[in-house]
């Protein structure tokens, strides 16, 4: 699939109206990503992990397409409730839940929960008696960018005891869930986890617990600045085939976050300062590591950077606007000579970027604008139509 990317002309015309830094989100691209997953992984319903990007327009779009939602807190439930999303379309997938989150779940009729420790059972039983629960198991995957199984997931050998304890406490033991880790490059990790889950389903049946649901988490990868050589269609189809083979009568869902929005958002930022240090040019941008580049620190991520300057390229350093020396974004990046006021485009900025940005040093948060609401979108459609007409002649 082709990722969303603004042209140089679009960047410059947008920046004439909107002060940088700002994010540009393409709803068309989000919808394309959603439909791609439904086409190649049809056995798994979608619970979008809204922590990746809770932009209201994106949430409304996905709800309209039929997506459900993975929520982690009372705040996320409140956002969805205000958008008209019913609690039956949510799963409270944070394995550790606080009192405020459990109260919100009860208030908004959220009935699905995940957990991985006995300490959660009593909390859920009191706050949401009779709720549907899935035990989260730890799985192995050394090909994931971000490991989620050190902090989360019960040992496999304890999973059914946890479900039995939940059942004894008046909760409904619904199923098993796992997460292979963020930005997973291996289909094998999913396939191995599915085999483990199948064994647990069979053992649960022998114990008198009929499990009906399986949550395979997220982890589907998107491109970064280092490039990515993964056939997503083949990856999803292989997983779908295993689900069909191992779980023909089970309700299955997935929780994509990064995959759904990562390729659908661009950042437009400006050079606000230039200097030379150690014979290398430095360019200071008006967005940095405490803003939308927070994923460099929190998410081990490298975002594709695009400069529009002319001339020979040389190794350059890019930094953010804060007074913190750690606010360095790129080192030895091959860039043409830039000057103050030049615009820089950063792609694949749709997930775990603005959502973890801060107001450190008092800098304003970069707003998100919707590309389809801008005149540049209409102009792009007109240009595409003209190209098609010429090609047809």
UniProtKB/Swiss-Prot annotation:
Outcome of mutating residue 319 to W: 7-fold increase in substrate specificity towards ornithine
Effect of residue 52 to C: No change in substrate specificity
Cofactors required: pyridoxal 5'-phosphate
Activity control note: Inhibited competitively by both alpha-difluoromethyllysine and alpha-difluoromethylornithine.
Swiss-Prot/TrEMBL catalytic activity: L-lysine + H(+) = cadaverine + CO2; L-ornithine + H(+) = putrescine + CO2
GO molecular function: lysine decarboxylase activity; ornithine decarboxylase activity
Keyword Iron-sulfur: no
Coiled-coil zones: none
Enzyme class, first EC level, given as a word: lyase
Positions bearing N6-(pyridoxal phosphate)lysine: 51
EC number: 4.1.1.17, 4.1.1.18
Pathway: Amine and polyamine biosynthesis; putrescine biosynthesis via L-ornithine pathway; putrescine from L-ornithine: step 1/1
Active site: 323
Signal sequence annotation: none
One Pfam match: Orn_Arg_deC_N
Lyase is among the record's keywords: yes
BP terms from Gene Ontology: putrescine biosynthetic process from arginine, via ornithine; spermidine biosynthetic process
An example Gene Ontology CC term for this record: cytoplasm
Other comments on record: Mutagen studies showed that it is possible to convert S.ruminantium LDC to an enzyme with a preference for decarboxylating L-ornithine when five amino acid residues (Ala-44, Gly-45, Val-46, Pro-54 and Ser-322) were replaced with the corresponding ones found in mouse ODC.
Protein name (record): Lysine/ornithine decarboxylase
Organism: Selenomonas ruminantium
Taxonomic lineage from the root: Bacteria, Bacillati, Bacillota, Negativicutes, Selenomonadales
